[in-house]
Amino acid sequence: MSSRISVSLLLLAVVATMFFTANVVDATPRSQGNMMRYGNSLPAYAPHVLYRFYNSRQFAPINKRNNAEVVNHILKNFGALDRLGDVGK
């Protein structure tokens, strides 16, 4: 019986310590200089940032090219290479 009491008291002490330290950390004051300087200029929610991110190219569907477009791309961009110069002739 005494072991149950000691374990419960130890558990209660640990929970109380965690509760009080969490409240102390949450209660630390913020510097008023930064809040006055930046607080009013920054919006709380900026959906345009999300729209710009999700409309970027990495989320766009992949467009497949046909073989002629691939060959034209290679000839246009790598035409200076000797081996690729005579592909279309």
Curated annotation (Swiss-Prot):
Name of the protein described by the UniProt record: Pigment dispersing factor homolog pdf-2
Disruption phenotype: Delay in the timing of the reproductive peak of egg-laying.
Superkingdom per UniProt: Eukaryota
Protein purpose: Probable ligand of isoforms a and b of the calcitonin receptor-like protein, pdfr-1, a G-protein coupled receptor. May not signal through isoform c of pdfr-1. Involved in locomotion; may play a role in circadian rhythms of locomotor activity. Modulator of egg-laying.
Signal sequence, renumbered to the chain: 1-27
Keywords: Signal
Lineage, highest ranks first: Eukaryota, Metazoa, Ecdysozoa, Nematoda, Chromadorea
GO biological process per UniProt: adenylate cyclase-activating G protein-coupled receptor signaling pathway; locomotion; locomotor rhythm; locomotory exploration behavior; parturition
